[in-house]
Amino acid sequence: MASFPCPIEETLLPVPCKVNLRLAVGARRPNGYHDIDTFFLPLPEPADVLRLRRFDGPGDIDLQCSDPELETDDNLVVRAYRAYAAATGYAPRLEVHLAKHIPHGAGLGGGSSDAAVMLRYLNDRADEAALSPVDLAALALTLGADIPFFLLGVPAVATGVGETLIPADPGLAGWCAVVVCPEARVKTAWAYAALDASRALPQKPGANLLTTAFDANKRAFCVTGAPMRNDFESVVFAAHPELGRVKERLLALGAAGALLSGTGSAVFGLFRKRQTATLALAMLTGSGPRAYLAPL
């Protein structure tokens, strides 16, 4: 009878997502990246789950995923593993199952967060080959601009292409976020190209950054002194008007502020009271799109 090796360790790790409380996009750099000024907020829901089985001796990574289309060498989990192995020489034999719950193409950073969890897992077990936090963040940046934030794991203001991080308190303790994930998918490259193209056109005066229901006096909901803002809303909502309607719906249901996350398609609302957020969640899920409640 054939015998099968037993893992020396089996680990189950949650993978959080993020939203952007602010996302201002600057000029395009020669390397294709854009300067940004953003406020990242990690959320516990929706969340992926990584199950890792580590075997004795060196090897490679075998990835299985609840979405078979993501079982490729281009998956950021695989790329993170191989980048870490190339940088440190630490390459344990791993069987990885990725339970995918963070929607792809939603602006919630699911793939980047998956990669950050893999990098942290490897670094915690690499002993003398382990990288310093600075070197680990530098390696993460080669894989994706927001992966260093997920390594940091706390609310932070990010500038540059996202690599310069300053931990910050958004002042939302006790609040709840409701994250709505419509079926639409927005490609990041398209969103940046569309934004660049729109800026080449004559601009209308008085761009409206209002994110609250206070239309009468134009009071903008603020987080640490800056209005909630996402420069991508103009182009993304024009291409996907249903996403703009989700934002309006969140505000109508009592959100103090609402915004597109990243390049979309997810839209989130911030609620002062859990009861109001729970009711909004029930109303939204009854109308179709997936929605999640995340305590802050």
From Swiss-Prot:
Enzyme class, spelled out: transferase
Keyword Kinase included in the entry's annotation: yes
The EC number(s) this enzyme carries: 2.7.1.148
Pathway where it operates: Isoprenoid biosynthesis; isopentenyl diphosphate biosynthesis via DXP pathway; isopentenyl diphosphate from 1-deoxy-D-xylulose 5-phosphate: step 3/6
Lineage top rank: taxon: Bacteria
Keywords: ATP-binding, Isoprene biosynthesis, Kinase, Nucleotide-binding, Transferase
Gene3D superfamilies in the cross-refs: 3.30.230.10, GHMP kinase, C-terminal domain
Segments forming a coiled coil: none
Active site residues of this protein: 18, 146
Name of this chain's protein: 4-diphosphocytidyl-2-C-methyl-D-erythritol kinase
Organism: Solidesulfovibrio magneticus (strain ATCC 700980 / DSM 13731 / RS-1) (Desulfovibrio magneticus)
Lineage, broadest ranks: Bacteria, Pseudomonadati, Thermodesulfobacteriota, Desulfovibrionia, Desulfovibrionales
